[in-house]
Structures are given as C-alpha cells and as structure tokens.
Design a protein with these regions (language model features):
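ABC family nucleotide-binding domain
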Residues: 1-145
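Conserved beta-strand-loop-alpha-helix hinge in the C-terminal portion
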Residues: 149-163
Length: 163
C-alpha cells in the first residue's frame, strides 16, 4: 500500500471505506441529496443510480423530507444523518465513525446504532469512537484508551467489567 499513488489510494478509500465525521464535513453549497451523491460520483456510478441510492439512504436515516436542503438549513442532528448516509453510499467494507450519534436525539441515536449493528452483521467492519457508554454497549468488542494508550481490550462484557 505504501507504493500506491495518491489516486490509487483515493480509489481504495472511496470504494472500501466509509467515514462518519463528528463535524459532518458536508459541502456547504450542496444539498443533502447532492452531498450523499458525491462518493457515488467519484466511484463512477451513473447519475440515475447515484440519485436512487442517495434517496434510499437518506430515507433510511429519516431524511427523505430534506433532500433539497443545504447544510445551513439543517439542524446538527439532520446534518449528522446526512453525513451517515454519505458514509454508507458505496457500501464500505470498513466504516469509521467518530461519535456518530453525538448530535442526535436519543431515539434517533438508537435507530442509527441499530442500522450500524445490522451493517456489521452483514459483514461491514464498524469502528466507533465514542465517550457514550450507551453507544459502546452496541459493540461486540471494546477497547478503552487512556492518554493515547490501550488500557483494556476484549469482548464487550469483559471490557465493561474492567472499567
């Protein structure tokens, strides 16, 4: 992998990785629908397929009614859900999520965590960084860090007992 060119690395990231950023990183000049379509465009998917996939993902995260809204017209929780839909656009094999429910209401957070659990059961590796014990309870394995070092690592039940 160290021998790959930047373009090749970008292709791997686009096709195999999904990123849910705590700060969303949505394009401010693009609508919710267009933001979710971006990774599909870079993957070379036809426009109609991009639109259909983006609409389906936005519906899945409860945002079908806000397709044409810009990020500035969305609440923090709505922006978070658009960012989650975008991260799932290319069916990543590895999903990296930084506080994916941090800006969501409790019920919406539970729905998103259930969705991430289902993706994991279907074969997607999901890595979540969180300070929220309720979110970590959805996991199968828990790594605890302190001062940048792993202080415990194991199945969720064992790691919870070590806390």
């Amino acid at each position: 992998i160290t021998q790959l060119r930047d373009g090749e690395l970008a292709q791997i990231r686009n096709r195999h990785f999904g990123f849910i950023f705590q700060s969303y990183n949505l394009f401010p000049e693009l609508t919710a629908l267009e933001n979710v379509m971006v990774p599909l465009m870079y993957a070379g998917r036809p426009r109609r397929e991009r639109r259909e996939r983006a609409e389906a993902l936005l519906a899945q995260v409860g945002m079908a009614h806000r397709l044409k809204h810009l990020p500035t017209q969305l609440s923090g929780g709505e922006q978070q859900r658009v960012a989650i839909a975008r991260a799932l656009a290319n069916n990543p094999t590895l999903l990296l999520a930084d506080e994916p429910t941090g800006n969501l209401a409790t019920d919406q957070g539970a729905e998103i965590m259930t969705l991430l659990q289902e993706l994991n059961q279907q074969g997607t590796t999901v890595v979540i960084v969180t300070h929220d014990p309720a979110v970590s309870a959805y996991g199968r394995r828990l790594l605890r860090l302190r001062d940048g070092k792993i202080v415990s690592d194991g199945p969720l039940q064992e790691a919870a007992l070590e806390a």
